[in-house]
């Protein structure tokens, strides 16, 4: 779950910026409307990553198929850069605490979304850019799954991930989903 929130934001940005063929390399290149979807802790994390650390992330991500767990990924980062490992571990713990605070239904939904997002993000970092259809399908799947959650699960997500909830409820997002997925 180390990159969980980043991944969720990245999936959202990828899915809803469909006409843009490249994902921004730098935080400053992310369009303002998508920056507002990124939680403050994640924004600070993204801004703090140096170009050298980005290169390390890309290098480590190339082996994403070999990682059985987040701990495997973190250990690989630690071998390459203790500083990057420390940054990643902090973010990982923030997200893990938020996920663990969710009720069971919400936790299952978020974990599934994180797993999908992690896979797509790792593929992207490894140079295997997912197709637009894959991104569209992933976005649609998660939005529909969110709509199918009980009100208690939605409330639980809203408490821990208010920006994510805003994303799922945002009328502009819904319109964009309809435009790109239909």
Swiss-Prot record:
Q: Give the keywords, sorted.
A: Coiled coil, Lipid-binding, Secreted, Signal
User: Keyword Transmembrane, does the record have it?
Assistant: no
Q: Main localization of the protein?
A: secreted
What are the subcellular locations of this protein?
Secreted
Q: Quick check: keyword Signal in the entry?
A: yes
**Name of protein:** Fatty-acid and retinol-binding protein 1
Tell me the first and last residues of the signal peptide. Answer: 1-17
The molecular function terms in GO held by this entry are: lipid binding
Coiled-coil annotated spans:
86-106
Q: Name one GO cellular component term.
A: extracellular region
What PANTHER family does this protein map onto? FATTY-ACID AND RETINOL-BINDING PROTEIN 1
């Amino acid at each position: 779950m180390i990159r969980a929130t980043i991944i969720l934001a990245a999936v959202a940005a990828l899915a809803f910026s469909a006409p843009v063929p490249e994902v921004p390399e730098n935080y400053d290149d992310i369009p303002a409307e998508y920056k507002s979807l990124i939680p403050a802790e994640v924004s600070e994390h993204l801004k703090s990553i140096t170009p050298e650390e980005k290169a390390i992330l890309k290098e480590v991500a190339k082996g994403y198929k070999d990682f059985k767990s987040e701990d495997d990924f973190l250990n690989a980062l630690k071998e390459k850069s203790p500083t990057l490992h420390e940054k990643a571990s902090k973010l990982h713990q923030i997200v893990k605490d938020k996920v663990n605070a969710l009720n069971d239904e919400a936790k299952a939904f978020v974990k599934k979304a994180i797993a999908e997002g992690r896979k797509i993000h790792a593929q992207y970092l490894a140079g295997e850019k997912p197709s637009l259809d894959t991104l569209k399908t992933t976005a649609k799947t998660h939005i529909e799954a969110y709509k199918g959650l009980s009100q208690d699960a939605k409330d639980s997500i809203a408490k821990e991930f208010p920006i994510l909830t805003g994303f799922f409820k945002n009328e502009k997002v819904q319109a964009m989903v309809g435009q790109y997925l239909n």
